[in-house]
UniProtKB/Swiss-Prot annotation:
Annotated positions of the N6-(pyridoxal phosphate)lysine modification: 35
SMART domains registered for this protein in UniProt: Ala_racemase_C (SM01005)
Entry-linked Pfam families: Ala_racemase_C, Ala_racemase_N
Protein name: Alanine racemase, catabolic
Function: Isomerizes L-alanine to D-alanine which is then oxidized to pyruvate by DadA.
Reaction(s) catalysed by this chain's protein: L-alanine = D-alanine
Isomerase as UniProt keyword: yes
Enzyme class at the top of the EC tree: isomerase
Gene: dadX
Entry EC number(s): 5.1.1.1
Gene Ontology annotations of biological process type: D-alanine biosynthetic process
Active site: 35 (proton acceptor), 253 (proton acceptor)
Cofactor(s) needed for function: pyridoxal 5'-phosphate
Amino acid sequence: MTRPIQASLDLQVMKQNLAIVRRAAPEARVWSVVKANAYGHGIERVWSALGATDGFAMLNLEEAITLRERGWKGPILMLEGFFHAQDLEAYDTYRLTTCIHSNWQLKALQNARLNAPLDIYVKVNSGMNRLGFQPERAQTVWQQLRAMRNVGEMTLMSHFAQADHPEGIGEAMRRIALATEGLQCAYSLSNSAATLWHPQAHYDWVRPGIILYGASPSGQWRDIADTGLKPVMTLSSEIIGVQTLSAGERVGYGGGYSVTQEQRIGIVAAGYADGYPRHAPTGTPVLVDGIRTRTVGTVSMDMLAVDLTPCPQAGIGTPVELWGKEIKVDDVASAAGTLGYELLCAVAPRVPFVTT
């Protein structure tokens, strides 16, 4: 028998999350973002559940080719564009839409020998300061691209740095307005947070990512609790050991948790080698046999300990939800000082996945 830990994916929930995105941005088309192997869910496992999308957005050329080979004929947007000039041959073959964010890409595209023009997303730096042309250069770049024989349809894109704040896109929108003054173009600006909370930035295409998987772009579940979005992934395991401890005994490496009175502790087959956060402190929420309780002590490589006081009936084989429909990944991440994004992306290869 295999270890009892597994990650279950509810693909019907993913379909529902996409429908919620469409209701949030009814006038825009949707790029479903499946970068980082679909945020750790597995692009080959989930892409068909997003089949009603208008396009897929990602980074990895191999994953884009996989989607084409699986039968996806719609648009595919490469969010960071091509990394080497020779990649343009594959972009041409598989008809990929490329982001252009730097001068060397302009030159490579101009010099490429393509069978047909590629659709282009021109990235403007609106304050994130990662990729993109400065706003004052945007129109010059736009005109350079418009003159190239290798360029098809063009869209202006940017990425908001603070869309999870109520006033978080004001300065970015000012920069974008400066960049596009007098320019007639399509726009793709909204990430997950802007899709939910800034309808003035929806324009032509929105790019939801984390919300498709049922986690919060702000890192706080309460911020999306009333949207109807639900978690797609449930990471679960079982209790494989029980200890009844007396006052003064300690649990785990370093003895970080001290028992104050007689207490039953359950040992769960899950640890940081599975992707559970090592820095999750005592008190991190967990569900045992449908009852909310807490972790105790330090998370080990392959195991963690939970307090069985609220669930005295629990024993060997009792099911444990580490995160999912009841224990939100955002809440586990918050306890561990990180984000749900990281935990979803970090589920280890040794954890088996099942889809429903």
